[in-house]
Amino acid sequence: MLETCRPMDIEARSFEIITELLGDRKLDPENAPVIKRAIHTTADFDYADNLVFSPHAVQTGLEALRAGCDIVTDTQMAKAGINKTILASLGGEVHCFMSDPDVAAEAKSRGVTRAWVSMEKAAQLKKPCIFAIGNAPTALVSLDALMAAELLRPALLIGVPVGFVNVVESKELIIEGGRAPYIVARGRKGGSNVAAAICNAMLYQIRR
């Protein structure tokens, strides 16, 4: 039987259902809004298990957003999915350099991916940034190299690329390196929609 629900109540009801289906699972209160938003976006309850957080990662992200940090993504899809109205009200904006002609030319000349070079370009930004990576493992590898060389210190690193080639390994590189606060989806799952959802979970906490 179909459930009657007013349009403005659908999202709230969805989160009620998510909470019900999680049952007696104990989620860290700081991380729960991010986990539930990822589940809401994907209808995949595996995120209750595979999202891992460095200590106080969400709080660190919230503080950075309140201070007006920018967000860097590795896809236009993730950029499109982030709530730019809230972000702009806090003084931030979203960047994606993947389609920039100079990035494409540099990547071709060096024989590396555009994702790799786009992270190098992002490292030149003057503002603190949250990096939301939902597609390219090489973006994570590039970020790790930049951090190791002390050329970059992300305010928060969201590592949720999806796929098969170097996906698991690149995520573990971020976790094991511990060079920046992180939220990582262990395993092969993730995606640009999940990267955007994690950003939005924090933005909505600020503007709820």
PLM regions: where:
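Charged, compositionally biased N-terminal leader segments and the immediate start
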Residues: 1-29
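A short, well-structured juxtamembrane/interface segment
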Residues: 49-64
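Buried hydrophobic positions in well-ordered alpha/beta secondary-structure cores of metabolic enzymes
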Residues: 74, 157-159, 198
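Short glycine/serine/threonine-rich phosphate/pyrophosphate-binding segments
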Residues: 78-81, 138-143, 164-168, 191-195
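Long, charge-dense
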Residues: 87-125
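C-terminal functional extensions of proteins
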Residues: 165-208
